[in-house]
Design a protein with these regions (language model features):
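Compositionally biased, charged N-terminal/linker segments
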Residues: 1-48, 146-147, 154-155
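Short, conserved beta-strand edge motifs with alternating hydrophobic and charged residues
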Residues: 7-9, 55, 67-69
């Protein structure tokens, strides 16, 4: 099986890479995704062992701040069933879940965060989905060449 690469976005005041670093075994479930295209990536394509870039959004500066790995493949997001959760989805049921999540484990925090501005300035990354107009997905695929360049920039 060919390893795939992904980028996930999180607002650091909601859940930061530092929060992940403090989590048990540096692992967490990636819940609350409520976009069908992102859900399909999680449910159908993200596989154990895939690489994940952790992106801090809605902050200054927006940056890729570290590397994670998928450690559990897509399974139903439990928050969709919890009426007290902000992610509650009343038309979903345990028998017919709509939303899915994966578990990720922190591999490392970058010494140098890779800022959105630096991504935009790098010719190797000019086609990266993250910087394409109108792309606001919280989960998106990353090409191997882009992955390698980001890893180099963050080291």
């Amino acid at each position: 099986m060919i390893k795939k690469y992904w980028l996930i976005k999180s607002e650091p005041e909601v859940f930061s890479i530092q929060d992940l670093n403090k989590s048990t075994n540096k692992t967490t479930f990636w819940d609350g995704v409520r976009n069908y295209q992102a859900r399909n990536f999680i449910r159908d394509e993200m596989k154990k062992g895939d690489g994940v870039l952790f992106y801090h959004s809605n902050t200054e500066p927006n940056s890729i701040v570290g590397v994670c790995e998928v450690v559990k493949e897509g399974y139903p997001d439990h928050t969709q069933f919890d009426s007290k959760s902000i992610h509650y989805f009343p038309s979903s049921s345990p028998e017919n879940p709509v939303w899915f999540m994966v578990d990720i484990k922190l591999q490392r925090i970058f010494n140098t965060p890779v800022t959105l501005d630096n991504i935009k300035k790098n010719s190797i990354l000019k086609k990266m989905r993250l910087i394409q107009r109108g792309n606001r997905l919280s989960v998106m695929p990353v090409e191997k060449e882009e992955w390698d360049e980001i890893i180099k920039m963050g080291s």
